[in-house]
Every structure is written in structure tokens, then in C-alpha cells.
Amino acid sequence: ELRYEDARRVLESHQQKAKRELAAREDAPPEALYYLACDDDPEVRGLVAANRSAPIQANELLQDDTSAEVRGELARKIARLMPDIPAVERSAIQDRLIGLLEKLAEDELPRVRAIVAEEIASCPTVPRAIARRLARDAEMAVCGPILEYSPLLSDEDLIEIIATSGAPGAAAAIARRACVSTSVSDAVVT
């Protein structure tokens, strides 16, 4: 296990290679990961964003990072944590994670939104509002996985999306769902 004093020495050394290694360590002290979330090097920040041990405060700093790669790594990590969060009993930390996921699902870059969509597509514990928002995205890379796999979309949601979606291929993604009701099937055909 990494001691706090050892992590502090790495931070004080200002050696990028050592900081990258520290940012990737699951046993790094939370304070060190928080400090590294503000590093000038986007690679260091990306490693913190991908680190499951990073404290929620570091994740919140990184949600608005100037680097799309950093936000993408954060989106991937947060979305992968979602299946582990029970739908009923949510703690304050879990609520903050959901807030991060909501923000990343609204990212200006389709690539970041697509990462969120791919990671949560079949997850039943994601808030339904996030799945519905991604399902209505104009980019197929974003809405496609949700339309095809999300268990959170109702028949009414799917029929409305077929009627109003501007994303080419939305109806085809819905048609590829494992189970499609007659009313949804009729909407796809017409």
C-alpha cells in the first residue's frame, strides 16, 4: 500500500512520469488524486479520471475538463459504476455520481455522450431521464445503443422517438431490440 508521505514526495518532485504512475494507482491517497486532477498534463488528469479510487471531488473537477479525452475517461468510469448502484437506497455520493453522469450525458462532444450511451445502454439502474435524453440525441452513435438495448424505454417512448427522431437509423436501432411490441413494430413499419 502506498503511504501518504511517498505520494507527497512524488507530487513535490514534479516528474511527469512519476505523477502519471501515481495517478493510475488504485492505492494512491485520495488527496494526491485530487491534487493530480488539477495537473497541467492532460494525460495525468485522464489517468485520474479513469481511476476508480479517485474521490468524488476529483471527479467533479474533471467533469468540466478542457480535454475531451479526460471527460471521455471520466464518462466511461462513471457509467461503469452505475450497475453497482442499487436503484433504491442511494447515498449522497451516489447522487453526486448520478449528477456527474447527467452532466457527461449532456457534453458538447458527441464522442463523450456516445461513451456514456455505450456503457449504460443495458443498465436498468441508470436514472430513466438519462436514458431518455440519450435516446433522443441527434447523433446515432449516441442514441443507437440506448434505442437498441435500454430496458428503461417504454413503448410510448419508442413510438414517440420513431415519429420525431432526426437521427437517421433510429427506427432501425429500435427494430433490432430483442423484444419489440406490436405497436412499436407497427410504428417502425409506417
Regions found by a protein language model. Give the residues of each.
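Alpha-helical scaffold segments
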Residues: 1-190
